[in-house]
């Protein structure tokens, strides 16, 4: 059997749409109409999405081969078949939406270049190829599925309690479709700057610095407890003639649900795992992707496969309730997708076995618990003491944290817990709340250099 090698980017080539030279950027934006990017907020003002994160992930190649906001035919293809017009599979609508009032005020049309401003500075351009209208509720419903149309995995109708459904439902009705280009490269703030590895850089580090041939991706939106640590260690035993050489932790950074951990604590918590030797730093690397999470379980897992293949991973671990919230999907929906496909979502076979599909190899995992009889963290498929199991409960752990109780070492490493405390002191609360979301939306993860917009 041939040895596994780094897969090509999804679509065959990494998208890189970032202008590095100031003089070229200034020529591109001279005389362009401008539009200040705005967050999507709930009626109470709580931010749930900022399109700048999608623009960053498109232009740096995380979403390759997507290059911008989708034209209408491509939107329909994605909703109906989870494929782009180029045939490559892709799970989610990527759209630049504006209100009818803003569209009228802008007075732009197909063929125009729109300069997108962020924090008062030039950020990116959108070369408008098409302008069309959507029904946001229809897009939201078709994005995630229904029990009637997707009976294999959808268990409950989606509603306003589902964060991803609300994000699409609250899209504005006017879509400006076209390619994005970043013209004023942002600088990441601490601590994000040391975890920023866009696909081209990540692939370079994996090949030349880490010298990993096989790499398994770990998706996270949580500070790691010991169960997460064991998942990473055990899933990494996959590979070919030897275990995977590297574990790439890729955190999703963006708007979170209230009660989640702050992004900074998530990144530095995972960093503590290798910094203090629980997994050797030679085998463990922490990174992130900008994305306001949609919590789409099997649909979200497709995006994770796209992102991590683009970053250079050969394998991806998937647990139960992957990227899920509530009970909208079967808890094993992602594993069903990657083991047999979901025909109603356009997959007669797993995503890595269809034409124009992914090359990343799935590693479906069961769960880990503490067994007092084995006196160790046990894998559910190995341990026979089911009646004695003590599950890792995220809500129970959050309750301990909220009470200021130091979790036992068997639940969370003390060095990881200290990162929660560190950011608790910064924000005066250990978890995401409205105040944190509003501050994060105002400050964002980046700063932009000052840049003048030349006249035409």
UniProtKB/Swiss-Prot annotation:
Entry's Gene Ontology molecular function annotations: ATP binding; sulfate adenylyltransferase (ATP) activity
What is one process in the GO biological process aspect for this record? hydrogen sulfide biosynthetic process
Quick one: which pathway? Sulfur metabolism; hydrogen sulfide biosynthesis; sulfite from sulfate: step 1/3
* Entry keyword set: ATP-binding, Nucleotide-binding, Nucleotidyltransferase, Transferase
Identify the InterPro entries for this entry. ATP-Sase_PUA-like_dom (IPR025980), PUA-like_sf (IPR015947), Rossmann-like_a/b/a_fold (IPR014729), SO4_adenylyltransferase_pro (IPR020792), Sulfurylase_cat_dom (IPR024951), Sulphate_adenylyltransferase (IPR002650)
In this UniProt entry, which cysteines form S-S bonds?
Answer: none
Q: Which domain of life does the UniProt lineage start with?
A: Archaea
Catalyzes what? sulfate + ATP + H(+) = adenosine 5'-phosphosulfate + diphosphate
Query: What is this enzyme's EC?
Result: 2.7.7.4
Class of the enzyme per the UniProt entry, highest EC level: transferase
Please state which protein family the record places this protein in: Belongs to the sulfate adenylyltransferase family.
Which HAMAP family does this entry report, sorted A to Z?
Sulf_adenylyltr
What PANTHER family would the database entry show?
PTHR43509, SULFATE ADENYLYLTRANSFERASE
Give the protein's recorded name. Answer: Sulfate adenylyltransferase
Q: Taxonomy-wise, where does this protein's organism fall, top ranks first?
A: Archaea, Methanobacteriati, Methanobacteriota, Archaeoglobi, Archaeoglobales
């Amino acid at each position: 059997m041939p040895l596994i090698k780094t897969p090509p980017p999804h679509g065959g080539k990494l998208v890189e749409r970032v202008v590095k030279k100031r003089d070229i950027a200034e020529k591109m934006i001279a005389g362009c109409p401008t539009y200040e990017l705005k967050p999507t907020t709930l009626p109470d003002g709580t931010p749930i999405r900022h399109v700048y994160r999608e623009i960053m992930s498109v232009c740096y190649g995380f979403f390759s081969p997507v290059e911008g906001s989708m034209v209408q035919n491509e939107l329909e293809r994605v909703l109906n078949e989870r494929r782009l017009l180029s045939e490559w599979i892709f799970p989610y609508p990527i759209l630049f939406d504006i209100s009818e009032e803003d569209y009228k005020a802008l007075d732009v049309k197909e063929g125009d270049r729109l300069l997108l401003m962020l924090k008062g500075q030039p950020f990116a351009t959108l070369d408008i190829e098409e302008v069309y209208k959507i029904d946001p509720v229809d897009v939201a419903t078709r994005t995630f599925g229904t029990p009637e149309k997707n009976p294999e995995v959808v268990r409950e109708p989606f509603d306003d309690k589902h964060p991803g459904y609300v994000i699409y439902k609250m899209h504005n009705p006017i879509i400006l479709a076209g390619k994005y280009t970043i013209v004023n490269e942002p600088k990441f703030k601490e601590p994000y700057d040391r975890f920023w590895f866009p696909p081209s850089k990540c692939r370079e580090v994996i090949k030349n610095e880490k010298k990993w041939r096989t790499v398994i991706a770990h998706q996270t939106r949580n500070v790691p407890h010991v169960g997460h640590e064991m998942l990473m260690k055990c899933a990494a035993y996959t590979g070919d003639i030897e275990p995977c050489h590297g574990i790439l932790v890729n955190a999703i950074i963006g708007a979170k649900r209230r009660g989640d951990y702050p992004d900074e604590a998530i990144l530095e918590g995972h960093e503590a795992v290798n910094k203090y030797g629980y997994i050797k730093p030679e085998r463990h690397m922490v990174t992130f992707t900008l994305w306001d999470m949609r919590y789409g379980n099997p649909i979200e897992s497709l995006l994770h496969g796209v992102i991590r293949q683009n970053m250079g991973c050969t394998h991806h671990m998937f647990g139960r309730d992957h990227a899920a919230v509530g009970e909208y999907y079967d808890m094993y929906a992602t594993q069903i997708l990657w083991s047999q496909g979901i025909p109603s979502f356009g997959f007669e076979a797993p995503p890595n076995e269809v034409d124009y599909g992914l090359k990343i190899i799935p590693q479906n995992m069961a769960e880990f618990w503490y067994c007092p009889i084995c006196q160790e963290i046990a894998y559910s498929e190995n341990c026979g003491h089911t009646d004695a199991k003590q599950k890792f409960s995220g809500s129970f752990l959050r309750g301990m944290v909220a009470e200021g109780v130091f979790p036992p070492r068997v639940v969370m490493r003390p060095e990881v817990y200290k990162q929660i405390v560190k950011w608790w002191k910064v924000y005066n609360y250990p978890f995401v709340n409205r105040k944190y979301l509003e501050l994060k939306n105002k400050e964002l993860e980046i700063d932009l250099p000052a840049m003048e917009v030349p006249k035409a």
